[in-house]
């Protein structure tokens, strides 16, 4: 009964959406593969990839600092995570958009001794660059916690064995702990990639309007039809997210190998054959006696 009710509700919703002129399906079809929308989707993917690459690298470094025996490194990492996890990403992106106004000029050199060069931030301003930096720095704080959880999942015996073999702390992390921690790190990282794809819609706060959400907003601002344009953007977000979810599924299955005690059919047959051999040997021994 419950399934029938749900099915009826779904059919009614689909029928209502298909016949509702407010959705503007003709406009939706017109702009679904518009060149501007495709370029915006490309910028969305580019922002996602670049921001995640930087975030993963910084996240690993921050996690190592957090787990380091050095008090200064641990403190710096903790403060970084406190700031970037404790403030909304939208607010951070607004600050990055105002960065050239806060720091009009950056001097490079040895403080109070010599200056090698200076950078005029207003001349170097790039909305795409600051959007990428803002997303990456925010995400790196979450990646640091994911990496730290993965490292903590590795048994202490592994670390003790590496130290007994004469490895330093950094060698132990690089050669022993991190490779084993990947099984725990990879699945949530896939979730973060999908989340990052959707978070790129917030870079209008910088403001950068070249990505998918910004492009649809520009187009709907001209033709005054925001609903079909939002449907276009949602379709592309769903399409890319679906592809990423499929990739995440296979990646999780790959890294979960050996984590489960469930045997394959081939392994069960081999075990049965081995048991039969043992039984046959036992029977022969009994007959000889």
Task: Give names to the regions the model predicted.
Residues 1-289:
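Transmembrane alpha-helices and adjacent helix-loop boundaries
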